[in-house]
UniProtKB/Swiss-Prot annotation:
Ranges where the record places region Disordered: 1-33, 60-101, 150-174, 192-271, 286-317, 357-379, 441-483
Glycan attachment points: 63, 123, 236, 437, 442, 498, 535, 541
PTM comment, free text: N-glycosylated.
Region feature 10 X 2 AA tandem repeats of N-M, mapped onto this chain: 102-121
Any one GO molecular-function label of the UniProt entry: actin binding
Protein name per its UniProtKB record: Uncharacterized protein YER158C
Extra remark: Present with 784 molecules/cell in log phase SD medium.
Family named by the database record: To yeast AFR1.
Gene source species: Saccharomyces cerevisiae (strain ATCC 204508 / S288c)
Sequence ranges of the Sequence repeats: 102-103, 104-105, 106-107, 108-109, 110-111, 112-113, 114-115, 116-117, 118-119, 120-121
Organism lineage string: Eukaryota, Fungi, Dikarya, Ascomycota, Saccharomycotina
Annotated Polar residues bias: 60-70, 157-170, 226-252
Amino acid sequence: MLQQGSSSRRSLHGNDFHTLTSPSRRDSLSIPRAVDARSASTIDLFYIPDATVSRRHSTLVANRSDNNGNGAPMRQYNKPNFASSSTSSLPSTRNRPSRYDNMNMNMNMNMNMNMNMNMNMNNHTTSDHNAHPQYRCRPNPSRRHSLMTIPEKYSGSRYSLRSSPPTYSNPRVRKELTPFQLQRKQMKSAFQFPNGENFTPRNQIARLPPSSTFPDSPSSSSLPLTQTGGPSSADNDSIATGTNNRSPQQTKAADANQKSESESPKAIRSNSKKISRFFRKIWSSKSSNSADSVEENSKTKQKRKNPERVVPEPITSLDQPVEIIKQSFSTVNNHETAVPSIKDSGIVQELTALGDNNRIPVLPPPRSPNRPTLSDKRTTKLYYCSQDSSNEDIAPEEKSTVFLKRLQDEWSTVYLNKLPLTASVPSSLSTTTDAANSSFINSSISSPAPSSSSSSSLVSRGPMQSISSSPTPAPSSGSSKSKNAVKSLRFADEIYVNDTWSAADYCRCDNTFLNNFFKGKSQDITNPSTFVGNNLSSTKNISNIEIKMEVNEFKRKEMRVHQDSAKYTHYYL
C-alpha cells in the first residue's frame, strides 16, 4: 500500500511520517477542495494535485536516503507541514480516527519497508530530473509560506512545488507587457526608428560628451558662464547632433566616463569654484547698478535744489515790453545741452493785445432809476398807467385819460358811462342827430389819432350820450333776428366804457374785486326795489352782473369742453 505513491499523500510531522488518505477518503472526511479558502492564521490552503505531491515527496525521500547513506543529517525542504498550520478544514492529530494511529504505528515499526519504497520512487524522480533538469529542489527558509498555492491548471509535472510570494502569484509565469510598457522600456536607451530617425533619451542629450571623444570641442572648465551669441549656439547644435548620431554603446560609455569624472573631488571643486565665481559676478553687477542709481538720485536732487534752467517771469504789467525766451534741450551722452534762446515777437504782440489777466468780473449794469420799486402790484400798475402825462389837456374830466387815449387808437366809437339795453344791438342807442346836437371835444386839436383814418371824437355825456366819428345806421328787425339765429365771432367797431374799478381790481390773485362785488350785492339785497327778475339791477353793479352772466352762459352752452372735465368749469357767482 505504501508503494502506491500516485494515490497517496504524506506529510512530515516532527520525525514521523503519516500517510494521508486517498481522494475518496478525503471526500468522506469532508476536507474542502475549494481554492481561496482563508484560514484563521492568514494562510491560504489550497488543494495540491496528487501527482505533484507524490513526485515531490518521492524526490525529498530519495535525497534523505542519500544523505543517510553518506552520514549527513536528514533535511527536507519545501515539504508542506499540514500540522503546523492552524486550520479547521484538515484533521487534527488529537481527533484522528483509529486508522491513522494504525498507519502511524506501521510507519514507526517498518522503516525498512519505507526505505525500499524510497529507493523505488527515487528511480521515478531521477527520470523526472533528467526530463526537466532546470526544476530542482531549493531550500525555502521561510516557513510562513510553506504551504503551496498552485492552481489546478498548472498541476502537471512541469511545475515544481515552490513557495509563492504573499501575493499568491506564480513568479515563473510572466505576464505580457502592454504596448505602453514596451514603448517605455524601449525609450530608456537610444534606438533608431524604422524611418531612419535616431532617438536619444533626454538624460543622454543634456549631458555633454567628454573631451576625449570630441577633441575639437572646448572643455567644460573653459566654457564661459555668461550666455553668448551665435557661435556658442552653433557649437551646442553641433554637439547635440553628434550625440544624436552616436550609437547606444558609445553613449553608455560616454555617460560612464562623465559620471566618473563628475564624481571625482577635482571636478566637484572646480564646479564649486565656477558657481562661486558666477554669484560673485552677479553680486558685483548688482552693487555697481545700485551705486549708479544712488549717484543718479543725488544728481536729480541737486538739480531740483539748484535748477539751471531759465524760467520766464510772470507778466505783471503791460507797460514794459515782455520777452519770451524759448530754450530747447537736447540730450547728448546723457547730458542736457541748452540751445540758444529764440525771441518770438508775434507771441509778445498777442499777449499785449490780450491785456492783463486779472480782469474785473462782469457785473450787470446798475438798476435804472425809471424802474419802479413799488412793492404793491396795484400801485405798480397805476405807476405805469400814469407815465404818459403829455396828453392830459385833451382828456375830459375823467381820471384815466391815458386809458381813453388808447381806446381811441383801437376803436372808432367809444361810449362813456352808457349802459346799453342789449349787448347785441349797441349801436341803436346812438344816432346821428344825438351826435350832432351833443357837445363834444375833438381830440385832433392837440394830437390826431395815429391808428384811425378819420379823426375820432371823445364825448362825455350822461348815461344816454355817446361818442361817434361816423353815423351808425339803425339795423332792421330782420338783420337782428338773423344775427341772433346764427352766432359767430366778430370784432365790434364801438366800445362802451363805464367808470368802474381799475384793471388792478380785476386781478384774480387779488380779492379786492370780489370784496367790492359782495359789498354791492349786499347793498342790493338790503334794497329789495333793485331786484328785476333774477338779476340785480343796481346802477353800479348791473353791468358787471350782465357780463358775468353772459360769460357763464357761454361756458355752459357754447364753449367746447371735454365731457370728463365739464364738472370742473368755473362759473361766476
